[in-house]
A protein has these predicted regions:
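Conserved acidic segment of CheY-like receiver
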Residues: 2-12, 17-21, 49
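C-terminal output helix
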Residues: 106-115
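Short hydrophobic/Thr-rich beta-strand motif most characteristic of the beta2 strand and flanking loop
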Residues: 25-32, 40
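Active-site residues of response regulator receiver
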Residues: 52, 82
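Receiver (REC) domain active-site loop signature in two-component systems and cognate sites
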Residues: 55
């Protein structure tokens, strides 16, 4: 079973993502922001990090950069969830080391489809 760290400061979004992923057979650990996610990632291995972009304390790009600085996370896929679909956001995500991104709102089936491609 693949393990996913789901990061979002919105409780309702976190619950929806977690519910969707658990129903698809994934093991899910939730984090409320980038700092919380980084703390959890240091003590447990994940097959994928799924993070919101706009969060207090440490946003998705900051979390991605911080994770990529450590050898343990260099190959871990990181998907960013964002309301921004601009080329600038995509470039910033790539520069930070993100594997990909999904624009909110998104279809839960599309989320599963993207994750299945990434964690093969």
């Amino acid at each position: 079973m693949h393990s996913i760290l789901a990061v979002d400061d919105s409780a309702s979004m976190r619950q929806m993502v977690s519910f969707t992923l658990k129903n698809a057979g994934y093991d899910v650990v939730e984090a409320v922001d980038g700092e919380d996610a980084f703390d959890k990632a240091r003590v447990r291995d994940f097959d994928l990090v799924l993070t919101d972009q706009n969060m207090p304390r440490l946003d998705g790009l900051g979390l991605t950069r911080r994770l990529r600085e450590h050898p343990k996370f260099r190959a871990t896929p990181i998907l960013i969830l964002t309301t921004e679909s601009s080329d600038e956001m995509k470039q910033a995500g790539r520069a930070a080391g993100a594997t990909g991104w999904l624009v909110k709102p998104f279809d839960p089936a599309k989320l599963i489809e993207v994750i299945q491609k990434v964690v093969r």
